[in-house]
Amino acid sequence: DRLDGPQGFRAAIEQELAGRPVQESDIILFIHGFNTSYGEGVYRYAQIAHDLKFPGIRTHFSWVSHTKALAYAADRDSLLYSRDDLVTTIQTLAATRGRGKLILVAHSMGAELLMESLRQLALTGRRDVLNELDGVVLQAPDINVNVFRAQAKAIGDLPQPFFIFTSQSDRALRLSALISNQS
């Protein structure tokens, strides 16, 4: 079934929550990363949710990735174009009645999209929405360190807990740093 905008999305989640026990009412929103098709993003998130044995509501925000390794700049433009839609999705989930915790998880370039969206919420005075977030997880975030610091400063108090998972041996992040002229 096709949902009728944010209200239809929220109504569908509230209907799903109505039939669940409280311990299964948490919501995780996953934002995929660079060079990831819709199907790959859904599959990756399904695997993560399965591995974590997450019993709550699983939601996936997909932005247009060009799914080409050489389309890095185009993907960065796409994520910025998608920022308003992610803000709307976060606002919708934050306002959902009957939910438990709301946790946001972003991978790779999706982490920059998430941070930009949180920054936008802060800059537009939507601290009420930020206060509804029960955690943020950035997995292998593909964000320039100085950009991240500026985003975090603009956001102010970051949702807690706030986790960043990265590895010095991550070849994709090293390549990203090389492409974007970061040391």
What are these model-predicted stretches?
Residues 26:
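Alpha/beta-hydrolase fold active-site loops
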Residues 1-5, 110:
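Acidic/glycine-enriched edge-of-secondary-structure segments
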Residues 29-33, 107:
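The conserved beta1-alpha1 loop
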Residues 1-2, 11-15, 21-23, 42-46, ...:
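Lipolytic serine-hydrolase domain surface
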Residues 86, 106-110, 114:
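Gly/Ala-rich beta-loop-alpha elbow adjacent to hydrolase catalytic centers
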Residues 32, 115, 139:
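Residues lining the SAM
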Residues 36-41:
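Short substrate-entry loop that stabilizes the transition state in hydrolases
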